[in-house]
């Protein structure tokens, strides 16, 4: 076994707490001192009482000797006690200080134990990094940790046992220090979050009870540990699974431990996955094995121990419960069990599948001498880990690049001169065809073969986008391969940020490690045991750097920064180019300590590089070059060739084989293959030295830190983004894209938080930049993370129809297009009504903010309101085609956030959004703009947003981002969400019959006076004349005012007897003739003269009903001081009645405030033209002041708000807005009652 970090195990002896001190006898001097003082006090008192003393004249002097006597007594009594208490206090301080020092030692021991335990039993999720390394299969049968497997993390005893010395007797013990010792032992006797391991070789079956998903996750972690730590020659892993559960264990087939040592099928060694325990016993009966671990996931459990087999059963099913391990009669509950996902177990198994004990594969012969130069020899037998361990400090960062004419190896050493190297930074120049690309590949491959990824990482840059480094991308050493920068100018700035970010990251690591001065000191600290993250040398190779600087001259500042601080930060630079123009380096040449020059086009180019023309005189042989060190020495060399084919060893014999066939690879045994005649032999492609070595490097060492993450070329899928996202910190925070942060070397979700002041959204971008997709992504993200009871959407689609694709979501109440103006208007009206209703609700319930309401909603389902989003795709089109809605939307954006109503819109330019609305938008998503100068985020960065990349844009902080594609299935969301759904926008029918409204009302509502159907729920709506005694109907001509009066008259007759209701109909245009043919008719007036007479008698009746002074309160409450029917005065065409010459109805003005008590009801219909002015007429003004109901039918909006907050608007005949008070408005369709 590889030795891990050491951990102390010797017991720590803890000193016991001190005993309480005994009282010590005072010395003779101290005992005599009170006597002496007493004598002195008596002498003073005698002196005081002598004749002629001041005491004889002033008795107050007697107090002084008395005070001396009292002070003496007190001092004598308490002095000894203070000394005793002071001694105990000092003992306590000393002991507590001792515990403090001991605590530091114990804490260090616990930290070292943590490191040791995590090294011995690492997290199963990291096991794949150990495959192929020196620790793989390290545990041998004789070792103490053989078959000892981690199962989770928890509390473990401290490695150094705390042993307390002999405690003093309880009666003599100091309670303070004893309590401190007890707390110290309780706190440090165990360590938390330590790996918990159990032995599997216990002589009996092991069962794990609990939730099946968690149990299988724990078993996957245990199996992968067994496979990584133990050789397949010493431990085999079998599976006994039912057909129902076989899919959970299909990944076992990849483990070399699961291959039968003797039995074979058509695909090779038979996988040891069986259906029953008996089948497994029969299959292994003839096999002599040291250890077999069998996973049992069937209904066949508890059959006892099987000789030579360790069985681990999926035990009793307990849904939702954590796993519990039952082993040898002991039950171990796991509070934090290990879990390994199926895909992670599959990755681990497939990595192990490439390894066999003693397996060497095909034999390869060296290619062009490179393998011998590096010290590899046979590439097939090349073990990178072994070579890396054998590389000494001198050979670190030192690699052969070729040979001199006499065959001596030429070494390139990029260590500092202080370490006998050539320096960290260098230059490579060579003309086309000179072998420059091959030299760069040789250097990169040699560096990777000689140095572990923990020592060296590479960042490979090819400005022109050639194939120089493409094959190296898969090596563990390679932090990134960056190509094709010439065609993607924004990527150059991105690389500049990435390199600057890497310098910043390394500086921060050095500061955190104790303000170390260099990476060398950092690595030295790690070697001495400091727990620091790996910080390898970063070797940056830039090909065609001259072209890079010619197009982006500002990039030289990055090279200069690396040249200045790269030595201490461990960032080494190699610049390569076909030619070196004079003055191109601009001060960088002082940092280049070594130079390699291949064949050049001219002598001047050679002199620019080497100071001589020797490179121009080199032969035309590719790979011929010169190496110049910092001392000026020139070394001629011929580059090693790594791109040539790798010669194979000649086979000793050729055996005919059956033609290959495709077979499924499963855990079931495969049927044998019938060999057919051997046809022609297919030629096997010969790998190159480069590819063969790269194949051997894969899986060895940790992956390099990613300095360069892939650009945002392809938008992510929303489903994957939501799966990988961390839990939201706010109610309405959802990820909708990815933000690229090259300086931080990370990609972070573009999270939009709509729960606060940023609840309104604007997506702005040029045509075809993905605005509609961004809105759909926002809708789908919220719908996927919230049910329809929490978020709801109402969409106005004036773009290309993209929002119609979300109509199937349960969260979407309606989608209105250009051809649906009524639905669009109703949608705005409903949202405005929702805001008013919620405002009243918040006020009535003392809710001060929507955030507070969301907290209350989470605790109680009562009165649950969803956050409502008005989504508008195509703001400019809406302003042009539905200008009347703009003001309502602006008001909604300004007021709605306080009550959970949001606005999200898209526009082509920021200028399309007026400042009054733009100021209300807190979340701004800026895609590519037609003119980057219009950007409100970052005009310079807006120029770098690529064209023809829909979804690309800038985040709020000016970083590049891409919007995710909404790949979620709306039907699936509907199935998953189920209940509830967003209420649809109710649309009234063009006509509703009177009889159907009465039939629909039922018995309870049918007893009231019905008006028609209301839009919200499509239910009949009643007019309560008991609560609101008057009704005013306003509307244009032919809008249905008279039909509304006709319906009301018939409803009064239907719901009241003649003794309870009488109607006085004022109808100057004779439109209500014969509407009532019963005893309910109290009078029909068709002229002003007749009206005066009728009203005169009505006034007398009302005056008689006025309460007399002797009417009691009970009579007033019951309205019983008069009897008779209620009088309904129905006036059609009020504008014909109230003329300039006078208004006969003025006689009723004084009775209107008392109408409810007097049984008077005034129902007035008037045209809406001039209604804003007419409402100041005394009768109508009184009605409005009294809060009467109003039915606003079709009218002109320029009249303004007549009743409530609603303006008149064009409406179909028979339709109107019934206003009953502030915030209580509903659209109704008046029941159609045909004329007689």
From Swiss-Prot:
Cellular localization per UniProt: Cell membrane
GO cellular component, one term: plasma membrane
Main localization of the protein described in the UniProt heading: membrane
MF annotations from Gene Ontology: ATP binding; ATP hydrolysis activity; DNA binding
Keyword Repeat: yes
Tree of life domain: Bacteria
Amino acids binding ATP: 430-437, 765-772, 1035-1042
Record key words, sorted: ATP-binding, Cell membrane, Membrane, Nucleotide-binding, Repeat, Transmembrane, Transmembrane helix
InterPro entries (UniProt xref): AAA+_ATPase, EccCa-like_Actinobacteria, EccCb-like_Actinobacteria, FtsK/SpoIIIE/SftA, FtsK_dom, P-loop_NTPase
Protein name per Swiss-Prot or TrEMBL: ESX-4 secretion system protein EccC4
Protein encoded by which gene: eccC4
């Amino acid at each position: 076994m590889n030795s891990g970090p050491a951990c102390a195990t010797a017991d720590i002896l803890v000193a016991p707490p001190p005993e309480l001190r005994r009282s010590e006898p005072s010395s003779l001097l101290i005992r005599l001192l009170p006597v002496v003082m007493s004598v002195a006090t008596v002498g003073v008192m005698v002196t005081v009482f002598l004749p002629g003393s001041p005491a004889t004249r002033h008795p107050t002097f007697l107090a002084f000797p008395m005070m001396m006597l009292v002070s003496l007594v007190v001092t004598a009594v308490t002095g000894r006690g203070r000394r005793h208490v002071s001694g105990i206090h000092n003992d306590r301080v000393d002991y507590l200080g001792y515990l403090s020092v001991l605590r530091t030692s114990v804490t260090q021991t616990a930290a070292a134990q943590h490191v040791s335990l995590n090294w011995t039993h690492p997290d199963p999720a990291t096991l794949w990094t150990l495959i192929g390394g020196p620790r793989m299969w390290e545990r041998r049968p004789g070792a103490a940790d053989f078959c000892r497997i981690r199962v989770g993390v928890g509390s473990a005893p401290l490695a150094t046992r705390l042993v307390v010395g002999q405690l003093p007797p309880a009666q003599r013990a100091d309670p303070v220090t004893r309590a401190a010792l007890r707390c110290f032992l309780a706190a440090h006797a165990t360590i938390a979050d330590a790996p918990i391991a159990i032995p599997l070789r216990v002589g009996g079956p092991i069962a794990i009870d609990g939730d099946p998903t968690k149990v299988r996750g724990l078993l996957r972690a245990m199996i992968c540990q067994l496979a990584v730590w133990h050789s397949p020659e010493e431990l085999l892993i079998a599976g006994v699974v039912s057909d129902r559960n076989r899919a959970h264990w299909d990944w076992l087939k990849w483990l070399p431990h699961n291959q039968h040592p003797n039995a074979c099928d058509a695909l090779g060694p038979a996988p040891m996955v069986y259906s029953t325990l008996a089948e497994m016993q029969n299959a292994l009966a003839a096999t002599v094995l040291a250890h077999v671990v069998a996973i049992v996931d069937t209904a066949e459990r508890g059959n006892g121990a099987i000789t030579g087999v360790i069985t681990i059963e999926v035990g009793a099913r307990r849904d939702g419960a954590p796993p519990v391990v039952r082993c040898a009669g002991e039950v171990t509950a796991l509070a934090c069990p290990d879990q390994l996902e199926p895909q992670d177990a599959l990755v681990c198994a497939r990595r192990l599948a490439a390894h066999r004990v003693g397996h060497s594969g095909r034999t390869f012969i060296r290619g062009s001498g490179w393998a011998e130069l590096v010290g590899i020899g046979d590439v097939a037998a090349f073990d990178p880990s072994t070579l890396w361990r054998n590389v000494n400090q001198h050979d670190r960062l030192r690699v052969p690049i070729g040979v001199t004419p006499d065959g001596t190896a030429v070494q390139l050493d990029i260590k500092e001169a202080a370490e006998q190297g050539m320096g960290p930074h260098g230059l490579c120049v060579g003309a086309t065809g000179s072998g420059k690309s091959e030299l760069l590949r040789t250097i990169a491959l040699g560096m990777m073969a000689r140095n572990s990824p923990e020592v060296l990482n590479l960042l490979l840059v090819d400005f022109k986008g050639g194939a120089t480094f493409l094959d190296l991308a898969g090596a563990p050493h390679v932090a990134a391969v960056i190509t094709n920068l010439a065609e993607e100018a924004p990527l150059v700035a991105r690389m500049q940020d990435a390199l600057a970010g890497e310098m910043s990251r390394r500086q921060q690591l050095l500061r955190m490690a104790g303000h170390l001065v260099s990476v060398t000191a950092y690595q030295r600290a790690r070697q001495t045991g400091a727990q620091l993250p790996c910080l390898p040398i970063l070797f940056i190779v830039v090909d065609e750097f001259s072209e890079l600087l010619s197009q982006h001259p500002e990039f030289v500042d990055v090279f200069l920064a690396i040249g200045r601080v790269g030595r201490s930060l461990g960032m080494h630079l190699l610049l390569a180019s076909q030619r070196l123009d004079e003055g191109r380096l601009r001060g960088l040449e002082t940092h280049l300590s070594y130079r390699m020059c291949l064949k050049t086009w001219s002598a001047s180019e050679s002199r620019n590089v080497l100071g001589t023309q020797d490179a121009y005189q080199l032969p035309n042989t590719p790979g011929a070059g010169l190496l110049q060190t910092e001392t000026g020495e020139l070394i001629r060399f011929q580059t090693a060739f790594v791109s040539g084919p790798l010669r194979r060893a000649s086979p000793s014999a050729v055996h005919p084989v059956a033609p290959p066939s495709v077979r499924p690879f499963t855990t079931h045994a495969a049927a044998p293959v019938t060999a057919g005649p051997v046809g022609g032999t297919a030629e096997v492609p010969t790998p190159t030295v480069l590819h063969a070595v790269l194949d051997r490097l894969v899986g060895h060492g940790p992956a390099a830190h990613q300095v360069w993450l892939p650009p945002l070329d392809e938008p992510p899928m929303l489903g994957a983004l939501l799966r990988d996202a961390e839990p939201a910190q706010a109610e309405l925070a959802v990820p909708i894209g990815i933000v690229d942060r090259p300086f931080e070397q990370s990609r972070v979700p573009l999270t939009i938080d709509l729960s606060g002041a940023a609840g309104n959204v604007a997506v702005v971008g040029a045509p075809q930049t993905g605005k509609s997709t961004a809105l759909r992504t926002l809708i789908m993200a919220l719908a996927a993370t919230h049910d329809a009871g929490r978020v709801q959407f109402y969409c106005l689609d004036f773009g290309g129809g993209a929002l119609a694709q979300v109509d199937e979501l349960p969260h979407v109440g309606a989608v209105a297009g250009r051809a649906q103006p009524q639905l669009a208007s109703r949608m705005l009206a409903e949202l405005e009504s929702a805001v008013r209703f919620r405002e009243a609700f918040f006020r009535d319930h003392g809710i001060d903010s929507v955030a507070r309401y969301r907290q209350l909603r989470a605790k109680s389902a009562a009165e649950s309101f969803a956050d409502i989003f008005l989504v508008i795709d195509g703001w400019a089109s809406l302003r042009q085609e539905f200008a009347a809605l703009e003001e309502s939307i602006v008001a909604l954006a300004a007021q709605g956030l306080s009550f959970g109503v949001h606005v999200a819109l898209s526009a082509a330019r920021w200028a399309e959004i007026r400042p009054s609305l733009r100021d209300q938008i807190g979340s701004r998503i800026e895609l590519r703009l037609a003119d980057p100068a219009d950007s409100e985020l970052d005009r310079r960065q807006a120029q770098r947003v690529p064209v023809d990349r829909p979804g690309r844009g800038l985040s709020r902080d000016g970083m590049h981002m891409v919007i995710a594609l909404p790949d979620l299935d709306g039907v699936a969301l509907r199935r998953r969400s189920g209940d509830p759904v967003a209420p649809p926008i109710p649309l009234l029918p063009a006509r509703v019959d009177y009889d159907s409204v009465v039939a629909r009302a039922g018995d309870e509502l049918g007893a009231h006076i019905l008006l028609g159907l209301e839009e919200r729920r499509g239910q009949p709506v009643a007019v309560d004349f008991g609560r609101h005694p008057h009704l005013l109907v306003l509307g244009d001509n032919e809008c249905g005012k008279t039909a509304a009066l006709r319906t009301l008259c018939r409803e009064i007759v239907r719901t009241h007897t003649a003794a309870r209701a009488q109607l006085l109909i004022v109808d100057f245009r004779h439109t209500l003739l014969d509407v009532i043919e019963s005893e309910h008719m109290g009078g029909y007036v068709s002229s002003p003269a007749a009206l005066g007479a009728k009203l005169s008698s009505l006034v007398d009746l009302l005056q008689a009903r006025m309460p007399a002074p002797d009417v009691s309160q009970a009579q007033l409450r019951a309205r019983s001081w008069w009897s008779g029917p209620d009088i309904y005065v129905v006036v059609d065409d009020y504008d014909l009645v109230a003329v300039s010459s006078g208004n006969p109805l003025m006689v009723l003005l004084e009775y209107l405030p008392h109408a409810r008590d007097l049984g008077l009801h005034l129902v007035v219909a008037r045209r809406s033209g001039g209604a804003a002015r007419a409402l100041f007429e005394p009768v109508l003004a009184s009605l409005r002041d009294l809060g009467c109901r109003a039915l606003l039918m079709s009218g002109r909006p320029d009249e303004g708000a007549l009743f409530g907050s609603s303006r008149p608007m064009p409406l179909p005949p028979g339709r109107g807005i019934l206003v009953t008070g502030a915030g209580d408005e509903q659209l109704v369709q008046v029941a159609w009652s045909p004329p007689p």
